[in-house]
Amino acid sequence: MCLWPLIQSAQASKPVPVETQHEDMIHDAQLDYYGKRLATCSSDRTIRIFNVIKGEAKGEPVILKGHTAAVWQVSWAHPSFGSILASCSYDGRVFIWKEVGQGQGKGSGGELQDGWERIKEHTLHTASVNSIAWAPYDLGPILACASSDGKVSVLSFQNDGSIEVNIFPAHGTGANAISWAPSVLSTVSGVSRSQQPSNSLAPQKRFVTAGSDNLIRIWGFDEEQKKWTEEETIKGHEDWVRDVAWAPNIGLPGMYIASASQDRTVLIHSRPSPSSSWTSAPLLPSLPQSQDPHFPDAVWRVSWSLAGNVLAVSCGDGKVSLWKEGVGKGWECVSDFSS
């Protein structure tokens, strides 16, 4: 695999190869909050953690074992909660790993795992857990999980070490991906935060899920009833939705969600204010030749930049493209490269 540093214009510079030493296909790679560590996971059932120095992975990786099937995804918690990593697998389990110091960590069976310890195990799903995501840090240590059993589970970690679990059906034919909304949304377009209504700035628990039913669904937490309720169902795709990503909206008006599908399209769902409806528009990878919204192959992953103004799209043909919204021109591809 490679690391691709980006310059300010959203152009990718030369790739930095990473020899992961995985023995099978790599499914995910995630940098931590500071960009100092890289976690990867693979069908070889392992997780590997590298130190990143000046944009390059250095030294031998820490290898975390315990899953009994392919590991689909890893997710770093905010550093305010410690050095914590979550992983999910085809084996139907979610593991929470914590760095506890060299020589102190013990995994299942008591083996040392290079200073990392598996501190929690979530086993309530009955099929593959395909996606995991930590909530914005100001909501607390909360992890959401999406599974092929059609359910979503939300794990809230308590101060006494216990976990409060809320699990509910989300997509009848399987949930493939999950992404949290910013906890404080820019609710009034063009109005500064100091002028926003006070109740609009309260932290809000909300996320979006993608399913094998070709739909994406938006869920919000009802504080009075203490349960998750469906707020919106958004149609548009004609096949499984493989991934979904809610854009950070730091300094940006409105809300954006990107979804990627087996139907070879990427849709941008936008909502300028809470009083308006969601609208959807496809990316057009064939411009200027045509208005065809189809990529060459199924689209597997979408990911926003930290500022929420650049979208990365990973296609099954092995290429990654970067997209920005032009002024009055829709979304434009500003860079692409082979992975």
From Swiss-Prot:
<feature type="repeat" description="WD 6">
    <location>
        <begin position="294"/>
        <end position="333"/>
    </location>
</feature>
<dbReference type="InterPro" id="IPR037363">
    <property type="entry name" value="Sec13/Seh1_fam"/>
</dbReference>
<feature type="repeat" description="WD 5">
    <location>
        <begin position="236"/>
        <end position="279"/>
    </location>
</feature>
<keyword id="KW-0472">Membrane</keyword>
<dbReference type="Pfam" id="PF00400">
    <property type="entry name" value="WD40"/>
</dbReference>
<dbReference type="GO" id="GO:0030127">
    <property type="term" value="C:COPII vesicle coat"/>
</dbReference>
<keyword id="KW-0853">WD repeat</keyword>
<dbReference type="GO" id="GO:0006606">
    <property type="term" value="P:protein import into nucleus"/>
</dbReference>
<keyword id="KW-0931">ER-Golgi transport</keyword>
<comment type="subunit">
    <text>The COPII coat is composed of at least 5 proteins: the SEC23/24 complex, the SEC13/31 complex, and the protein SAR1. Component of the nuclear pore complex (NPC). NPC constitutes the exclusive means of nucleocytoplasmic transport. NPCs allow the passive diffusion of ions and small molecules and the active, nuclear transport receptor-mediated bidirectional transport of macromolecules such as proteins, RNAs, ribonucleoparticles (RNPs), and ribosomal subunits across the nuclear envelope. Due to its 8-fold rotational symmetry, all subunits are present with 8 copies or multiples thereof.</text>
</comment>
<comment type="similarity">
    <text>Belongs to the WD repeat SEC13 family.</text>
</comment>
<dbReference type="InterPro" id="IPR001680">
    <property type="entry name" value="WD40_rpt"/>
</dbReference>
<dbReference type="GO" id="GO:0031080">
    <property type="term" value="C:nuclear pore outer ring"/>
</dbReference>
<feature type="repeat" description="WD 4">
    <location>
        <begin position="170"/>
        <end position="229"/>
    </location>
</feature>
<dbReference type="GO" id="GO:0032527">
    <property type="term" value="P:protein exit from endoplasmic reticulum"/>
</dbReference>
<dbReference type="InterPro" id="IPR036322">
    <property type="entry name" value="WD40_repeat_dom_sf"/>
</dbReference>
<dbReference type="InterPro" id="IPR015943">
    <property type="entry name" value="WD40/YVTN_repeat-like_dom_sf"/>
</dbReference>
<keyword id="KW-0653">Protein transport</keyword>
<keyword id="KW-0677">Repeat</keyword>
<dbReference type="GO" id="GO:0005198">
    <property type="term" value="F:structural molecule activity"/>
</dbReference>
<feature type="repeat" description="WD 1">
    <location>
        <begin position="21"/>
        <end position="60"/>
    </location>
</feature>
<keyword id="KW-0968">Cytoplasmic vesicle</keyword>
<dbReference type="GO" id="GO:0051028">
    <property type="term" value="P:mRNA transport"/>
</dbReference>
<feature type="repeat" description="WD 2">
    <location>
        <begin position="66"/>
        <end position="107"/>
    </location>
</feature>
<dbReference type="GO" id="GO:0005789">
    <property type="term" value="C:endoplasmic reticulum membrane"/>
</dbReference>
<comment type="function">
    <text>Component of the coat protein complex II (COPII) which promotes the formation of transport vesicles from the endoplasmic reticulum (ER). The coat has two main functions, the physical deformation of the endoplasmic reticulum membrane into vesicles and the selection of cargo molecules. It also functions as a component of the nuclear pore complex (NPC). NPC components, collectively referred to as nucleoporins (NUPs), can play the role of both NPC structural components and of docking or interaction partners for transiently associated nuclear transport factors.</text>
</comment>
<keyword id="KW-0811">Translocation</keyword>
<keyword id="KW-0256">Endoplasmic reticulum</keyword>
<keyword id="KW-0813">Transport</keyword>
<keyword id="KW-0539">Nucleus</keyword>
<dbReference type="GO" id="GO:0090114">
    <property type="term" value="P:COPII-coated vesicle budding"/>
</dbReference>
<protein>
    <recommendedName>
        <fullName>Protein transport protein SEC13</fullName>
    </recommendedName>
</protein>
<keyword id="KW-0509">mRNA transport</keyword>
<dbReference type="GO" id="GO:0032008">
    <property type="term" value="P:positive regulation of TOR signaling"/>
</dbReference>
<feature type="repeat" description="WD 3">
    <location>
        <begin position="124"/>
        <end position="165"/>
    </location>
</feature>
<keyword id="KW-0906">Nuclear pore complex</keyword>
